UniProtKB/Swiss-Prot annotation:
Residues 1-243 are annotated as: Pyrophosphorylase. Pathway: Nucleotide-sugar biosynthesis; UDP-N-acetyl-alpha-D-glucosamine biosynthesis; N-acetyl-alpha-D-glucosamine 1-phosphate from alpha-D-glucosamine 6-phosphate (route II): step 2/2; Nucleotide-sugar biosynthesis; UDP-N-acetyl-alpha-D-glucosamine biosynthesis; UDP-N-acetyl-alpha-D-glucosamine from N-acetyl-alpha-D-glucosamine 1-phosphate: step 1/1; Bacterial outer membrane biogenesis; LPS lipid A biosynthesis. It comes from the Bacteria. InterPro entries: Bifunctional_GlmU, GlmU-like, GlmU_C_LbH, Hexapep, Hexapep_transf_CS, MobA-like_NTP_Trfase, Nucleotide-diphossugar_trans, Trimer_LpxA-like_sf. This is Bifunctional protein GlmU. It comes from Gluconacetobacter diazotrophicus (strain ATCC 49037 / DSM 5601 / CCUG 37298 / CIP 103539 / LMG 7603 / PAl5).
């Protein structure tokens, strides 16, 4: 008989059985060596707690988040869900007990904010196990377990005849028990009434003087209740307690995001070199070359191409547009259909119209550039006067020559031409030509005589 409930298709929960998720998020994470609460550290551009909140919200009727004192940032992220404060950090059972008044009358699952990658499917399977779906009867207690590649010092789940008999910590395990590959992930689910009673009975007579949630497993077994393990992949149940583990979790999230992008019809030429944010949208037929970074808030429309070594955040790339290589799109930028943003071009809060091109070595900030306009190499918008930002508006079908400096606020009308090397400080009318540079003067023989004088000076020391 299998000792665990296998990873299977998700089961629907009975409509009459309410379920509450209690998320423990009070830990500061001393091993992270950070002033930031552990659950606020980002994975793929968003706080790790956000993943758990979003998945739990799709499964549970109610979510309660347990935070520590002074963790207003975490409480704000948890909104609109209920938040309770664990004034003294006295262990996981003590933390869960702070939410006991909000357990309700159905099932309660205790999740961990620093274990953010558990999927909604696994949460549903745990609740289904507790409710008895797929079994002859429900479990008095269901717990999540995994088979990590390196079991290391994880607590081992000891089973007999398909039921959990006990959790044994690595330090207390015999050689036979240490050989067990099924490990405890700490996530538990039980009926609200049972959970309240068990939490109230947990004692702190241990070396750390803390109240451990895992003790309720032994209580359930002692009462003769069925305790079952629901197995999930290690990547879902990994905890994050250090910067190294944060990096491992980031790699896991990136694998998920890349797989989703590929399944959605985007091409990633070298997926392992592309880094996505949790909210990155890549429409079908998007092509992403190697070594591209997507920050939060990026949408790339169908058929666009993002070339190598480009960095995008907070922007929209239109259908068929071409970005890079070595381009940077900053927040507030919107690149129109079939527009080009070339190598070493930076856009910030700039709209580039359909078919417009900025192919080389430009900075375009706080600007609106009309359709089919060409921006020459080296053009910049001078948008900042040291205190305020100012806008540059360039119409449709314009030609801005190379090395032009556009001093905002300034407007260039449709069809206008700006000569190369110009400094533009005044508005340019439609179809006009603007020339803002000093007239060239040639002095015959002056170059040779000047160089000769300089060489003599160098020889004289």
């Amino acid at each position: 008989m299998n000792a665990t409930v296998p990873s299977a298709a998700p089961a629907d929960l009975p409509a009459h059985r309410p379920a509450t998720a209690v998320i423990l998020a009070a830990g500061m994470g001393t091993r992270m060596k950070s002033d930031r609460p552990k659950v606020m550290h980002p994975l793929a551009g968003q706080p790790m707690l956000r993943y758990l909140l979003d998945n739990a919200a799709s499964v549970f009727d109610r979510i309660v988040v347990v935070v520590g004192p002074g963790m207003e940032q975490v409480a704000a992220l948890a909104a609109p869900h209920a938040v309770v404060v664990q004034q003294d950090r006295l262990g996981t059972a003590h933390a869960a007990a702070q939410a006991a008044d909000l357990f309700g009358t159905g099932d309660v699952a205790v999740l961990y904010g620093d274990n953010p990658l558990i999927t909604a499917d696994s949460m549903r399977r745990m609740l289904a196990c507790r409710a008895g779906e797929g079994n002859s009867e429900g479990a008095g207690l269901a717990l999540m377990a995994m088979r990590p590649r390196d079991p290391g010092r994880y607590g081992r789940v000891v089973t007999q005849d398909g039921l959990v008999r006990r959790i044994v910590e690595w330090a207390d395990a015999s050689d036979e028990e240490r050989a067990i590959t099924l490990c405890n992930a700490g996530v538990l689910c039980a009926g609200a009434e049972d959970f309240r009673r068990w939490l109230g009975a947990v004692r702190n007579d241990n070396a750390q003087g803390e109240y451990y949630l895992g003790d309720v497993v032994a209580m359930a077994v002692a009462e003769g209740r069925q305790v079952r393990a629901v197995e999930a992949p290690e990547d879902e149940l990994r905890g994050i307690n250090s910067r190294a583990e944060l990096a491992e979790a980031e790699a896991c999230v990136q694998r998920r995001l890349r797989a989703a992008a590929l399944d959605g019809g985007a091409t990633l030429v070298a997926p392992e070199t592309v880094f996505l944010a949790a909210d990155t949208v890549l429409e079908p037929d998007v092509l992403v070359q190697p070594h591209v970074v997507f920050g939060p808030g990026v949408t790339v429309r169908r058929g666009a191409e993002i070339r190598a070594f480009s960095h995008l955040e907070g922007c929209v790339v239109g259908p068929g547009a071409l970005i890079g290589p070595y381009a940077r799109l900053r927040p507030g930028s919107d690149v129109g259909a079939a527009a080009h943003v070339g190598n070493f071009v930076e856009l910030k809060a700039t709209t580039l119209g359909a078919g417009a091109k900025a192919n080389h070595l430009s900075y375009l900030g706080d600007a609106t550039i009309g359709p089919a306009t060409n921006i020459g190499a080296g053009t910049i918008t001078c948008n900042y006067d040291g205190v305020f930002k100012h806008r540059t508006d360039i119409g449709a079908g314009c030609f801005v020559g190379s090395n032009a400096i556009l001093v905002a606020p300034v407007s260039i009308g449709d069809g206008a031409l700006v000569a190369a090397g110009s400094v533009i400080t005044q508005d340019v009318l439609p179809d006009a030509m603007a020339l803002g540079r000093a007239r060239q003067t040639n002095k015959d023989g002056r170059g040779a005589s000047l160089q000769a004088a300089l060489r003599r000076k160098k020889e004289q020391g």
